[in-house]
């Protein structure tokens, strides 16, 4: 191949609208070969510890992720090399033994809460996007999602938010906003900001030859 792939990082707190922004990018570039990689499939393999111990892990902390593996995979995709992407079992809190063979694409979107935390990973991105949404809105979205899709009780969601999600957001996620090239208020509802972002991606695509 002669073209160099473009890597777009999309981050923000839980419930900020990252997925909506990512979907908007994918829809806009549907005529291109595009790949979305979620950071949370790169949680560490925890097959060596018990299920009870896995439940105690703080999954909103940078150390929960196998960032070295993610960096090596993004670097390989930029070289148009095939990777063996992990498959994460969200019910067992560890990786499955199987992997997904992933071919490189023209546009690579990396989505996750902590993708801007490590400079090595930031340096592999052409565009860094932070989806900035009010804390109350993010909490309500997370509450409704976890109760509806994951069978959680209201009390358990609130407890996790106050004890883990909110402090980790304030300590690790919010500070990465300063590394973003583009900040999108109100997530996927901000169509003007998304249009500006996709225009920038198109401009870079034309230069990546």
Swiss-Prot record:
One cellular component term (GO) for this entry is: cytoplasm
Q: What class of enzyme is it?
A: transferase
Which residues bind ATP per the record? 12-19
Query: What Pfam families does its record include?
Result: PRK
The molecular function terms of the Gene Ontology recorded here are: ATP binding; cytidine kinase activity; uridine kinase activity
Name where it's found: Cytoplasm
In terms of domain of life, where is this protein from?
A: Bacteria
Against HAMAP family, the record matches this protein to: Uridine_kinase (MF_00551)
Q: What name has this protein been given in UniProt?
A: Uridine kinase
- Origin organism is Listeria innocua serovar 6a (strain ATCC BAA-680 / CLIP 11262)
State which gene encodes it.
udk
């Amino acid at each position: 191949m002669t073209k160099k792939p473009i890597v777009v990082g999309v981050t923000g707190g839980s419930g900020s609208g990252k997925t909506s922004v990512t979907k908007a990018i994918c829809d806009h570039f549907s005529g291109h070969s595009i790949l979305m990689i979620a950071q949370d499939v790169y949680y560490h393999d925890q097959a060596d510890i018990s299920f009870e111990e896995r439940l105690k892990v703080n999954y909103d902390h940078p150390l929960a992720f196998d960032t070295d593996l993610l960096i090596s995979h993004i670097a390989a995709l930029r070289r148009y090399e095939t990777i063996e992407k992990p498959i994460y079992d969200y019910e067992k809190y560890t990786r499955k033994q199987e992997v997904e063979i992933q071919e490189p694409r023209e546009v690579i979107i990396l989505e996750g809460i902590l993708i801007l935390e490590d400079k090595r990973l930031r340096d592999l991105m052409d565009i860094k996007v932070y989806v900035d949404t009010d804390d109350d809105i993010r909490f309500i979205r997370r509450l409704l999602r976890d109760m509806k899709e994951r069978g959680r009780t209201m009390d358990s969601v609130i407890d996790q938010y106050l004890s883990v999600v909110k402090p980790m957001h304030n300590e690790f996620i919010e500070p990465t906003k300063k590394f973003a090239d583009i900040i999108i208020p109100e997530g996927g509802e901000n169509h003007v900001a998304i249009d500006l972002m996709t225009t920038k991606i198109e401009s870079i695509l034309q230069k990546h030859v």
